[in-house]
Amino acid sequence: MSSEMCTVCGLPKELCICEEVAKEQQRIVVKIHKRRYGKEVTVIQGIDPHEIDLQDLCTYLKSKLACGGTVKDGVIELQGNHIGRIKDLLSKKGFSASQISL
């Protein structure tokens, strides 16, 4: 085992549960915004960028939903209307389904 210890929980890095606890405490809001020419964008907000790597989460969602997307100002934007599948995908990544509002 490595001698590195987590500064938050005091456990070794391999056993650290800080990120899982942070995921369960997030209050996530998913909305659909209309853009130019009637294009729809799924916007995911409420995830703390200091505790969760938004770029990795965005890459995961883009690959599962087969769409384009980006991270802007702590908000994940995905091209298209994906509100039907987003709750299930976020739950699989460890976020609490009861904390996700559509």
From Swiss-Prot:
Highest taxon above the source species: Archaea
PROSITE patterns linked to this entry: SUI1 (PS50296)
Keywords recorded for this protein, A-Z: Protein biosynthesis, Translation regulation
Sample GO molecular function, one term: translation initiation factor activity
Biological process (GO), any one: translation reinitiation
CDD domains (alphabetical): YciH_like
InterPro entries: DENR/SUI1_TIF, SUI1, SUI1_arc, SUI1_arc_bac, SUI1_dom_sf
Family: Belongs to the SUI1 family.
HAMAP family reported for this sequence: SUI1
Protein's name according to its UniProt entry: Protein translation factor SUI1 homolog
Provenance organism: Methanothrix thermoacetophila (strain DSM 6194 / JCM 14653 / NBRC 101360 / PT)
Lineage start: Archaea, Methanobacteriati, Methanobacteriota, Stenosarchaea group, Methanomicrobia
